[in-house]
Structures are given as C-alpha cells and as structure tokens.
A protein has these predicted regions:
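Extracellular receptor-binding modules and their adjoining Ser/Thr/Gly/Asp/Asn-rich linkers
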Residues: 1-44, 70-149, 176-201
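C-terminal structured domain segments
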Residues: 144-180
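A cross-kingdom feature marking solvent-exposed beta-strand/loop segments within repeated
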Residues: 54-73, 162, 171-179
Length: 201
C-alpha cells in the first residue's frame, strides 16, 4: 500500500528518570502548588538540545518545566527525534520525494498525541488554575511549555506555566515575577500543550 504524505513524526530516542536537582530552594518560585522550596534546576542532560522533550510527572510532583525547574525525582523524560530512522514494514508511507516517513513497524516508537492542555483564549491563567482530567499519566511536551528564569546577580525574575500531576488531573497556572504577565503574553490567543502516550516503549 502506498500513501502520499509530507508529515514525518519524531521517533523515540531515549527515556531517562529525572534524578536529583541542584540549587534546590534557591529560586523561590512561588505558585499555588508550593513556595518553591522543593524546586531546583534539572541536570544538563535534560535541557533543550533540539529534540522534542516529553515529561511524565509522578503523582503530586510539580514544577516549571519550561525553565527546567522541577522537584527531586519528579518523574521521567522521553526524547523523540527526527534523526531516528524509520523501519520499513507494513503500510509504508512516503513523501513526495519518495522518503519513508511512516510505517506500522515504527508506529509504536512515535508519540501518540491524544489531547491537549488546552487553555482557551482570554482565560485568565494567572489568577485561575486550569485543569484537565485524565485517566492515564500523560507525557507533556516540554517544548510547548512557556518558562523563563533570569538572575543578574541582583534581581531574580521568572515566568511561565507551572504544572502539577495529581494522579487524575494535570493542573497548570501561569506565574510571574519581574517579567511579563499572562495578559501581556498569551492570554489573547490561549495555549495548547500536547499530551501524548507512548505504546510499546
């Protein structure tokens, strides 16, 4: 069977448990989920390296993932990449140049986006907690999570989406200090953070 398409998914690259953080409690990133005393900076191998990063939080863990601020042993991270080769097999899909971009043999290594942490336009995420009910522990696309931490030695600033997994809800809140607020950034258009499952990993 030959199907023409231009879309190529990323494929599973690796999965690693998030370990201890550094500088725990140094940046008191205050939110409805905690005063920041348990948050620290993740190890460099979990920072943005050009791949897609998918975070799965353990129950009752939280953090500011877009700024690489999480709790100790917060969960796991999967990286997916376009540089992983697709294995030819049943139901191969090719692009217009004849490149293999999907196959049933490799489908289990692709993230299956099954929903979104979908904050609607004009929702006041800075003064309200947004929650999504889920029957599974989601993998959250960190690349779509706004987050920034600044420190010039005198003034500390931060902003972004703080996320918490309760075991049945993914909860989020926009926080800011000495940086732009929600209404100045994304409130007018909203925000969609993909939520995925991985099958066969």
């Amino acid at each position: 069977m030959l199907v023409d398409s231009q879309n190529r998914s990323t494929l599973f690259y690796d999965q690693r448990a998030l370990g201890a953080v550094t500088d725990k409690g140094y940046y008191r990133v205050d939110s409805p989920f905690g005063n920041g005393s348990t948050l620290g900076i993740t190890q460099p191998q979990f920072w943005n390296d050009g791949n897609l990063r998918w975070l799965q939080l353990d129950t009752n863990k939280y953090g500011l993932p877009g700024a690489d601020l999480l709790e100790d042993n917060a969960g796991s991270m999967i990286r997916t990449s376009r540089n992983v080769g697709i294995q030819s097999g049943y139901l191969d899909v090719f692009d217009s140049a004849g490149n293999l971009i999907w196959s049933a043999a490799s489908a289990s290594k692709m993230p299956r986006v099954v929903g979104f942490f979908d904050v609607p336009a004009n929702y006041d995420l800075q003064n309200n907690t947004f929650a999504v009910n889920l029957s599974f522990n989601p993998w959250i696309l960190v690349n779509n999570c706004p987050g920034n931490l600044s420190d010039d030695g005198t003034v500390v600033g931060y902003s972004g989406i703080v996320l918490k997994w309760t075991g049945s809800q993914l909860q989020g809140r926009y926080i800011t200090k000495n940086q732009r607020n929600w209404s100045q950034t994304l409130q007018g258009r909203g925000l969609r953070i993909p939520i995925a499952q991985f099958v066969g990993i």
